[in-house]
Amino acid sequence: MEEIADKTFFRYCLLTLIFAGPPTAVLLKFLQAPYGKHNRTGWGPTVSPPIAWFVMESPTLWLTLLLFPFGRHALNPKSLLLFSPYLIHYFHRTIIYPLRLFRSSFPAGKNGFPITIAALAFTFNLLNGYIQARWVSHYKDDYEDGNWFWWRFVIGMVVFITGMYINITSDRTLVRLKKENRGGYVIPRGGWFELVSCPNYFGEAIEWLGWAVMTWSWAGIGFFLYTCSNLFPRARASHKWYIAKFKEEYPKTRKAVIPFVY
């Protein structure tokens, strides 16, 4: 009976993730989360960005520690290997990235992160963290699927690593530029910035595309689609922001997030 209830709960959570994407994309076409270059007043109290990132991303780590040991595949080396890229990404996002923000030392008075937005992100990470951890540790049933598991894992891992490299190096460039300009904004140049305004978002989408291939599941596909629904509208808004701010100086050949396409 408990197994049936757990499976029903998992399915409802998965459906929530999958169907949350389209309305999120529509909403973010008209309203951008007020942090970073889109920061604005009227969203209530704020907190230091490093603290916000640490707290709102943290469920991906501690929830995994709580859930994973109780899965049917918790001790399966393949499940542990499969989940490692997810944990590596979120260790960086929860620990390393906030530390990098903290060390950047640019003035933070006008750059507070709204607690309401952090709370929404925290809630999403609770939902998605549960889905991904529970799927890999308990509901995935093709670990013994011969060589297909390894083909999907290797191909997905190559895609994931490529995306993570683009994401991390682009984030590092943005943090460095903001530090050098005392919290101000300049036109990012070099690398993937020559092709798109937001290569950090492009890289993250590529990561979760690789994750979808590795997991070969609706859980992975749902995460990838929601990532695109969340980040691509923001990338488009950031692209327009750059053009409005820098006008003729901004490279006209750059796209928003997908090279040569969008």
Swiss-Prot record:
GO cellular-component term (any): membrane
Enzyme class, spelled out: oxidoreductase
UniProt note: pH dependence: Optimum pH is 6.8.
GO molecular function: 3-oxo-5-alpha-steroid 4-dehydrogenase (NADP+) activity
Record-annotated membrane-spanning stretches: 13-33, 51-71, 79-99, 113-133, 148-168, 205-225
Regulation: Inhibited by the 4-azasteroids 4-MA.
Pfam families from the UniProt entry: Steroid_dh (PF02544)
Catalytic reaction list: a 3-oxo-5alpha-steroid + NADP(+) = a 3-oxo-Delta(4)-steroid + NADPH + H(+); 5alpha-campestan-3-one + NADP(+) = campest-4-en-3-one + NADPH + H(+); (22S,24R)-22-hydroxy-5alpha-ergostan-3-one + NADP(+) = (22S)-22-hydroxycampest-4-en-3-one + NADPH + H(+); 3-dehydro-6-deoxoteasterone + NADP(+) = (22R,23R)-22,23-dihydroxycampest-4-en-3-one + NADPH + H(+)
Membrane topology category: Multi-pass membrane protein
Pathway in which this enzyme or protein is active: Plant hormone biosynthesis; brassinosteroid biosynthesis
Keywords for the protein's UniProt record, in alphabetical order: Brassinosteroid biosynthesis, Lipid biosynthesis, Lipid metabolism, Membrane, NADP, Oxidoreductase, Steroid biosynthesis, Transmembrane, Transmembrane helix
Family from the record: Belongs to the steroid 5-alpha reductase family.
Name used for this protein in its record: Steroid 5-alpha-reductase DET2
